[in-house]
């Protein structure tokens, strides 16, 4: 796009120019970590955030008892960058190991009916192979992936030698001899990545599994942590440490870059100039920003086609411990509109349930997003009450979040489709002029929050000229 054309998108009148060494777009973990590193090295850094808060896809629901998470649920003891940052800024960490046994106890719901675990091996819908009939459906898939994962290192998913595995989960499972009925049971039910097994790369899931295994191999006695006050406390602490206050409500609409300078235009008319720009926003958001000169080739295809996981979360406070009436666990793994229900245990005693969270992913999130928020909440609660009559009138909805409907994320974690890793995996983080890219979707060796931190570190080193 020519300079005159890019100028045409500037709101009128353009406000006073703001000059920095580096402008970071997005105040999530990756952007704030990059800003922190660069400020430590003496750079003048300005962070722009379109939302009303910092944290990005780390979202603590502070209106709910115990501050449960709608994004960035917990993190392992091997998340070195995240833990070091929390300790640097005196964010207290809470060991979640005591609650893990409670989390592992889930009720299984098939065809709108709770199936006692003792009855699962002989259930007519149990299509697991002989010798595996007792395994919980979702855990069977993880077992199969672990037993067949060829990746010897977490970054090996980007090695061309493994690109033959950049096929759909469905195709790979069929090649292992599994029928459609089994794939629907162990993968498509409460799907964690994508909308179906047909739209997700198996190579990506080998990466996910390799990362989980690498964390386990570290041998820590602690299962994981959350932060006091919610995990959002960590990005908030990073933001508070910055010399320049994070600029909220700054929706970037255009970036132009030259050999040694860049200009950033916001929807409110403000204009920022810097030698370097760091874009930490998801590609689903980045593709709506006008960039001049235009990005072309595989990187442009990545920006336009890499998707993010559809995920909704409903937080509910129980008016009474209804699970004590029916003698079942409050946790449920269902094939109903209730999705996956998790009891949050944020009190001093792990036996105390402070709230319940319904995880609503993939096609279920799609269905709910077509409803009004009130109707979506009502349909989920109605589903829970149908499955658990003891829960009737016992659930108070207190927070609901759709990541796809959030205009600053349009989904949660990145989803690599079949063939996309081979096609443009090596190009997603390539600098474009003075524009650099980070975010969980550009991480190579780590997942989740640590992946975001990895990418923030990498992009800061790019700006510093170290890599």
Where are these regions (language model features)?
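Conserved flavin/dinucleotide-binding core of flavoenzymes
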Residues: 6-10, 261-263, 310, 325-467
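Short hydrophobic core segments
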Residues: 25, 48, 252, 271-285
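Conserved beta-strand-loop-beta-strand element in the redox core of flavoprotein oxidoreductases
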Residues: 256-271
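N-terminal Rossmann-like FAD-binding beta1-loop-alpha1 element of flavoenzymes
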Residues: 20-47
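Glycine-rich FAD pyrophosphate-binding loop
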Residues: 39-62
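Active-site/ligand-binding neighborhood in enzyme catalytic cores
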Residues: 149-251, 258-261, 415-416
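Flavin (primarily FAD) binding-site architecture
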Residues: 279-297
């Amino acid at each position: 796009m020519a300079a005159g054309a890019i100028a045409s998108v500037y709101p009128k009148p353009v406000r006073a120019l703001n000059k920095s060494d580096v402008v970071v777009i997005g105040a999530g973990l990756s952007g704030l970590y990059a800003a922190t590193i660069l400020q430590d090295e003496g750079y003048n850094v300005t962070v722009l955030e379109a939302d009303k808060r910092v944290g990005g896809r780390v979202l603590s629901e502070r209106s709910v008892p115990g501050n449960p998470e709608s994004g960035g649920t917990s993190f392992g003891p091997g998340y070195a960058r995240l833990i070091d940052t929390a300790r640097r800024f005196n964010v207290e960490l809470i060991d979640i190991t005591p609650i893990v046994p409670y989390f592992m106890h889930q009720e299984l719901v098939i065809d709108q009916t709770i199936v006692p675990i003792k009855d699962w091996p002989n259930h007519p819908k149990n299509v697991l192979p002989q010798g595996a009939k007792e395994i919980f459906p979702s855990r069977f898939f993880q077992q199969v992936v672990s037993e067949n994962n060829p990746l010897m290192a977490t970054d090996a998913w980007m090695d061309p030698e493994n690109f033959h595995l950049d096929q759909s989960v469905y195709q790979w499972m069929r090649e292992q001899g599994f029928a459609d009925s089994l794939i629907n049971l162990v993968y498509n039910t409460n799907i964690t990545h994508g909308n179906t097994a047909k739209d997700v790369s198996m190579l990506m899931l080998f990466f996910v599994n390799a990362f989980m295994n690498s964390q386990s191999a570290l041998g820590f006695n602690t299962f994981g942590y959350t932060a006091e006050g919610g995990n959002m406390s960590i990005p908030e602490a990073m933001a508070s440490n910055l010399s320049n206050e994070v600029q909220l409500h700054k929706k970037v609409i255009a970036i132009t870059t030259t050999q040694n300078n860049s200009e950033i235009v916001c929807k409110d008319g403000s204009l920022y100039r810097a030698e370097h720009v760091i874009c930490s926003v998801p590609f689903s958001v980045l593709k709506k920003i006008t960039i001049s000169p235009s990005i072309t080739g595989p990187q442009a295809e990545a920006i336009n086609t890499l998707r993010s996981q559809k995920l909704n979360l409903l937080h509910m406070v129980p008016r009474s411990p209804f699970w004590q009436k029916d003698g079942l666990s409050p946790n449920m793994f269902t094939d109903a509109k209730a999705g996956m229900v998790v009891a949050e245990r944020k009190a001093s005693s792990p036996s105390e349930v402070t709230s319940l969270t319904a995880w609503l992913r993939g096609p279920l999130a799609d269905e709910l997003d077509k409803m009004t928020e009130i109707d979506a909440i009502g349909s989920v609660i109605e589903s829970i009450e149908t499955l658990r009559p003891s829960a009737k009138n016992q659930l108070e909805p207190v927070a609901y979040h759709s990541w796809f409907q959030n205009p600053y994320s349009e989904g949660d974690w990145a989803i690599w489709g079949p063939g996309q890793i081979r096609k443009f995996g090596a190009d997603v983080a390539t600098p474009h002029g003075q524009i650099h890219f980070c975010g969980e979707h550009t991480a190579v060796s780590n997942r989740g929050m640590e992946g975001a931190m990895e990418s923030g570190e990498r992009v800061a080193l790019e700006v510093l000229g170290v890599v």
